[in-house]
């Protein structure tokens, strides 16, 4: 049996009617269907094969005894972003002709609104959420339906889905928007207590004060075996009547649609999603890292200013190599040092990549140029390094960044250099950021700024959206 969430006020739910068009801060994952079980580790923990039939996405080991700890210990996932080993599940679907069909995939958008006034908090480790009502008899603003050839999302049943295009398949989607205000105490809902409710215009109540990203789960069924689908005749699995170990199956209308979410994001991933992505109003797409580290030290040194700059609010870069005369012109270099996030021991390392994310741009408006990331040692400190005592610089760059005057977030691929450092047993890595060799100026935000300066470890493998 599931907790009835229909009593939660949904009048203020934002963007449930068409969440893929959300224009605010967000990130997303695509997770393929993996398996079907009569299990529900949130509301029927330990009772294998006694729940309704559920289709599972994400973590491939989800069953009746799954927890955050088991998800992270066995993180294999069908999700494209390998920072997300969450478990997602929803009831199985039966077509009007009686065929029980598997979904193709689900795409979840993590979204929010009004983050400037009411910022988000990361998902706590172990958080479990429910959405929808498995006894529902009418429309809910948390549940939406889509025929891929139709007029967009609706919360009413009855549309006839046709082929997406001639000679193709019928596609039917169900969207489920989860509550986004946690009570701050209970990681797990119970039959008598909702551990989360919906925000009111982005604001959480005193009883549920912790604002978290809205989990907008969008499940897609792709059905090439039919040419039309009457959604009023589609059914979803309900809890069976158990006769000992024998199941007597029950089915309900689409209004019984609901879903479960068991957080399995890495703690770094959950933290980055809120603090360095959504709270800054960004759409980060799939660029939420498995792990990351802020620059533990960053500064700049100048040939015209032989002084340390222990505390900086801007990082500067400029050099001029024209006519082969680098040393005859002023030169300003930024120095950055990072702890290296280790590669996961229990996942395919080939799916992962190290990248630097930094915010900044060129001062001049004379077009785009490339700047260079030069390797150096990590035996320096921002409090004491200056031009004349700086570590040696190797002008054979590890990476280049092509950029113009627009000040924005930028990604730099440093994967080869970081893996080499790891192979050498290093736990830290440093670079100089050098200019375009044409005399132009560049500036970037340091690690302790709102935009920060981070070394990211991202893992990704594309999940097909059929």
Model-derived features: where do they sit?
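Gram-negative bacterial Sec-dependent N-terminal signal peptides
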Residues: 1-22
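Primary mode marks residue(s) on the alpha4-beta5-alpha5 output face of response regulator receiver
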Residues: 24-51, 55-176, 184-288
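Flexible, small-residue-rich N-terminal segments that precede or flank a structured functional core
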Residues: 287-343, 375-378, 437-438, 448-452, ...
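Extracellular/lumenal carbohydrate-interaction signature centered on repeated Trp-anchored short motifs
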Residues: 328-330, 342-352, 421-424
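A short beta-strand element within beta-rich, extracytoplasmic domains
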Residues: 336-338, 348-363
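Short, surface-exposed ligand- or partner-binding patches at beta-edge/loop junctions that are enriched
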Residues: 353, 424-435
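Beta-strand-rich interaction/scaffold domains
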Residues: 361-427
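Short beta-strand-plus-loop segments that form exposed binding edges in beta-rich domains
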Residues: 432-446
């Amino acid at each position: 049996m599931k907790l009835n969430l229909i009593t939660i006020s949904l009048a203020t739910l934002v963007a449930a009617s068409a969440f893929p068009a959300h224009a605010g801060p967000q990130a997303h994952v695509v997770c393929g269907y993996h398996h079907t079980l009569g299990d529900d580790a949130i509301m029927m923990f330990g009772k294998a094969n006694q729940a309704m039939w559920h289709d599972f996405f994400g973590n491939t080991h989800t069953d009746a005894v799954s927890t955050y700890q088991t998800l992270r210990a066995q993180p294999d996932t069908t999700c494209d972003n390998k920072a997300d080993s969450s478990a997602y599940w929803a009831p199985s679907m039966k077509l009007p002709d009686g065929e029980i069909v598997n979904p193709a995939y689900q795409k979840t958008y993590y979204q929010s609104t009004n983050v400037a006034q009411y910022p988000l908090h990361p998902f706590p480790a172990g958080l479990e959420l429910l959405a929808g009502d498995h006894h529902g008899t009418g429309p809910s603003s948390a549940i939406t339906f889509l025929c891929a050839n139709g007029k967009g999302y609706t919360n009413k049943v009855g549309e006839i889905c046709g082929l997406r295009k001639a000679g193709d398949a019928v596609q039917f989607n169900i969207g489920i928007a989860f509550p986004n205000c946690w009570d701050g105490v209970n990681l797990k809902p119970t039959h008598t207590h909702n551990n989360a409710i919906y925000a009111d215009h982005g604001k959480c109540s005193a009883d549920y004060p912790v604002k978290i990203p809205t989990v907008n789960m969008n499940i897609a069924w792709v059905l090439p075996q039919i040419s039309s689908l009457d959604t009023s005749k589609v059914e979803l699995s309900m809890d069976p009547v158990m006769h000992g170990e024998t199941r007597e199956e029950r089915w309900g209308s689409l209004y019984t649609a609901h879903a479960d979410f068991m957080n399995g994001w890495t703690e770094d991933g959950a933290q980055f999603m809120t603090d360095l992505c959504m709270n800054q109003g960004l759409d980060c797409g799939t660029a939420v890292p498995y792990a990351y580290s802020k620059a533990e030290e960053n500064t700049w040194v100048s040939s015209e200013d032989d002084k340390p700059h222990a505390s900086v609010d801007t990082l500067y870069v400029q050099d001029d190599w024209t006519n082969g005369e680098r040393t005859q012109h002023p030169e300003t270099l930024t120095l950055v040092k990072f702890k290296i996030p280790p590669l996961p021991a229990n996942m395919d390392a080939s799916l992962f990549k190290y990248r630097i994310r930094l915010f900044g741009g060129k001062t001049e408006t004379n077009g785009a140029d490339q700047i260079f990331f030069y390797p150096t040692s990590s035996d320096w400190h921002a409090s004491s390094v200056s031009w004349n005592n700086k570590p040696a610089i190797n002008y054979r760059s590890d990476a280049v960044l092509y950029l113009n005057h627009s000040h924005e977030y930028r990604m730099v691929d440093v994967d080869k250099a970081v893996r080499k450092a790891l192979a050498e047993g290093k736990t830290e890595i440093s670079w100089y950021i050098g200019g375009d060799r044409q005399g132009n100026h560049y500036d970037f935000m340091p690690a302790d700024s709102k935009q920060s300066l981070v070394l990211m470890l991202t893992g990704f493998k594309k999940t097909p959206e059929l």
